[in-house]
């Protein structure tokens, strides 16, 4: 998705960059690779032992933000910021301080829970503010991001709320009306939410003819 957006912007004469926390950038793509394997392992272990996914990777995030200051973007488009490569407190403090317009495309529910990326399969609604927010997580050991030794969902929920709210110019994008509905029940409800479905490759996926449908 990021590469498609990048290439479209480039074709339209816009300057664009991609920052990633995994592997390397595709050939010809301008951008920045955040962190390294050693930092990734340290962040994973911090989460395993203390349940703090998103709160590691301090030094590599500082280096990334230094690079971002050199780029001076007119807009920052976030996608998944979990995955053990960013320190969310530093990132959002920077975005708030510099008053940069932000688009945040959510691909799951991690941003507004105290632990998990999905909760429908266990019918959990603790993440809703009316229910007091996440606490006593029953899946912190069994569901990504796998906090094996400590349930830190209550602290995570409170801190994420403090970190992710209060951005002056932020718009959330979801790929489905279902996820939009969840966001509007979460502590992110202060932000406008737009639904933009994920695109598909029309060279591979095309409507069938009536004859093909009957086969």
Model-derived segments and their meaning:
Residues 27-32, 90, 114-119, 124, ...:
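Short aromatic-enriched loop/helix-cap "lid" or pocket-rim segments at secondary-structure transitions
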Residues 29-62, 80, 143-152:
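A short, charged, and often flexible helix/loop element on the N-terminal side
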Residues 65-86, 100-107:
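Short N-terminal targeting/anchoring amphipathic segment
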Residues 80-85, 106-117, 140-148:
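A short, histidine- and acid-enriched strand-loop-helix "catalytic/donor-clamping" loop
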Residues 96-97, 110, 127-172, 187, ...:
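Membrane-proximal helix-turn-helix segments that form the acceptor-binding/catalytic region
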Residues 157-160, 206-215:
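A short helix/loop element that forms part of the nucleotide-sugar donor recognition site in Leloir-type
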Residues 178, 199:
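Carbohydrate-associated surface elements
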């Amino acid at each position: 998705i990021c590469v498609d957006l990048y290439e479209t912007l480039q074709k339209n004469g816009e300057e664009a960059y991609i920052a990633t926390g995994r592997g390397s950038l595709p050939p010809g793509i301008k951008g920045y690779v955040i962190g390294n394997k050693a930092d990734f392992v340290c962040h994973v272990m911090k989460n395993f032992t203390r349940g703090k996914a998103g709160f590691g990777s301090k030094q590599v995030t500082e280096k990334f933000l230094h690079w971002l200051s050199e780029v001076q973007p007119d807009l920052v488009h976030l996608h998944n910021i979990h995955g053990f490569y960013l320190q969310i407190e530093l990132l959002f403090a920077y975005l708030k301080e510099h008053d940069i317009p932000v688009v945040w495309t959510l691909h799951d529910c991690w941003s507004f829970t105290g632990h998990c990326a999905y909760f429908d399969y266990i019918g959990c609604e603790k993440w809703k503010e009316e229910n007091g927010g996440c606490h006593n997580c029953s899946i912190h050991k069994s569901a990504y991001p796998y906090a094996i030794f400590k349930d830190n969902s209550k602290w995570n929920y409170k801190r994420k709320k403090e970190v992710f709210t209060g951005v002056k110019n932020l718009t959330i994008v979801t790929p489905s009306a279902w996820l939009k509905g969840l966001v509007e029940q979460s502590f992110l409800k202060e932000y406008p939410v737009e639904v933009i479905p994920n695109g598909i490759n029309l060279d591979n996926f095309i409507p069938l003819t009536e004859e093909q449908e009957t086969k």
